Design a protein with these regions (language model features):
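Active-site loop architecture of trypsin-fold serine endopeptidases
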Residues: 1-23, 29-74
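C-terminal recognition in membrane/secretory proteostasis and scaffolding
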Residues: 15, 28-29, 33, 58-167
Length: 167
């Protein structure tokens, strides 16, 4: 089932992950744990050769909270949108095709409290609908943002709930 949440730095593997054995270790050729088997890509519900594991360094960050509180609260911003591709950059008259255009901001989210703005209008060019406005994130804590995954990876690696972040 798609939860809508993506796992930054997820490891793709061909190791068999079937119902009942997720949560097991993913080992490298030296027998070292590099991840925790988590999910499969399947239309039948069984292993079809594509599995995914949470990296062990991510698990190390999360496990103490799970042991202590029984849950882990992920840092989040509260936005959805789209990466700036060359077509969108042209339409928005941007110099570079990089960054993340905010389409929606979740009410009450950190993004909402910070005053970030989502899209409020669209424009049609050559029969294709494009966003006409909305804030564009081009950096996070002085690191360049080329796409949403740059933001998600930064949140996962560097931030905890309640931490400030400069966009």
């Amino acid at each position: 089932q798609d939860s809508g949440f993506s796992i930054p730095d997820v490891i793709q593997t061909d190791a068999a992950i079937n119902p009942g054995n997720s949560g097991g270790p993913l080992l490298n050729m030296k027998g070292q744990v590099v991840g925790i088997n988590t999910a499969i890509q399947s239309t039948s519900g069984g292993n079809s050769g594509i599995g995914f594991a949470v990296p062990s360094n991510t698990a190390i960050k999360i496990v103490p909270s799970l042991i202590e509180d029984g849950e882990y609260h992920h840092p989040w911003i509260g936005i959805s949108g789209r990466d700036i591709d060359p077509d969108l950059a042209r339409v928005l008259e941007l110099k570079d095709a990089k960054g993340f255009l905010i389409i929606t901001v979740v009410d009450g989210s950190p993004a909402d409290k910070a005053g970030l703005k989502g899209m409020t209008a669209t424009q049609v060019i050559d029969g294709k609908e494009y966003p006409a406005d909305g804030d564009i994130i081009i950096s996070v804590d002085d690191k360049e943002v080329r796409k949403i995954s740059d933001i998600l990876i930064h949140l996962q690696r560097e931030k905890s709930v309640g931490d400030a972040m400069t966009l």
